[in-house]
Curated annotation (Swiss-Prot):
Pfam family, one: Pept_tRNA_hydro
Top-level taxon in the UniProt lineage: Bacteria
HAMAP family xref list: Pept_tRNA_hydro_bact
Entry GO CC: cytoplasm
Name this protein carries in UniProt: Peptidyl-tRNA hydrolase
Source species: Mannheimia succiniciproducens (strain KCTC 0769BP / MBEL55E)
Coiled coil: none
Alphabetical list of InterPro entries matching this protein: Pept_tRNA_hydro (IPR001328), Pept_tRNA_hydro_CS (IPR018171), Pept_tRNA_hydro_sf (IPR036416)
Active-site annotation: 22
Main location group: cytoplasm
Compartment(s): Cytoplasm
Record-linked PROSITE patterns: PEPT_TRNA_HYDROL_1 (PS01195), PEPT_TRNA_HYDROL_2 (PS01196)
CDD domains: PTH
Length: 194
């Protein structure tokens, strides 16, 4: 039985943000929807687009919050409460400044590292930080004052290509995660570099 019951892809809603670095988490859930042939549907009570799928014989729920990033925990908290999903059964996919494009890593727990989507998710899960994170590397602009503009802009074609390769590998690892467990998926993904 899979340890993960809910996979969340963080991003900002609307066409304006669709191709920006901050939406890397959403990109992966959309990729999984295409790969495993499920449709995400708007569900107002969960403040997001949701789906239920059976992958590798395991039932899992997917969520893309339709709130802005800094309020995305509202969606995670609402769905987790409704379906009685514990923080330890949640995987949140998000963009990661501290990893280069072409790298993605899974970890459990930790702080929010300044990421407002993680910050709100932690707050909405009663300050429980013990959920899993799948961090999609987007690189860092080099100066903390440039971070906000950087995450809300599109990656260069070279960076996007590297990010896409990491997303493809991460999508393959999600199937491993659901069939064979998080340790096996983590070992494979954390050793990958595009």
């Amino acid at each position: 039985m899979s340890e993960i019951k809910l996979i969340v892809g963080l991003g900002n809603p609307g066409d304006k943000y669709a191709d920006t670095r901050h939406n890397a988490g959403e990109w992966l859930v959309e990729r999984l929807a295409r790969r495993f042939n499920f449709n995400l549907k708007d569900e107002a009570k969960f403040f997001g687009k949701t789906a239920r799928a059976v992958i590798g014989g395991e039932e899992v729920r997917f969520l893309i919050p339709t709130t802005f990033m800094n309020l995305s925990g509202k969606a995670v908290g609402a769905l987790a409460t409704f379906y009685r999903i514990k923080p330890e059964e949640i995987l949140v996919i998000h963009d990661e400044l501290d990893l280069p494009p072409g790298v993605a890593k899974i970890k459990q727990g930790g702080g929010h590292g300044g990421h407002n989507g993680l910050k709100d998710t932690i707050a909405q899960l009663a300050n429980n930080k013990n959920f899993y994170r799948l961090r999609i590397g987007i690189g860092h602009p080099g100066d903390k004052n440039l971070v906000s503009a950087y995450v809300l802009s599109k990656p260069s074609p070279i960076d996007r290509s590297a990010i896409d390769k990491a997303l493809d590998e991460a999508a393959s690892c999600m199937e491993i995660l659901l069939k064979d467990g998080i340790t096996k998926a983590t070992n494979r993904l954390n050793g990958f570099k595009a």
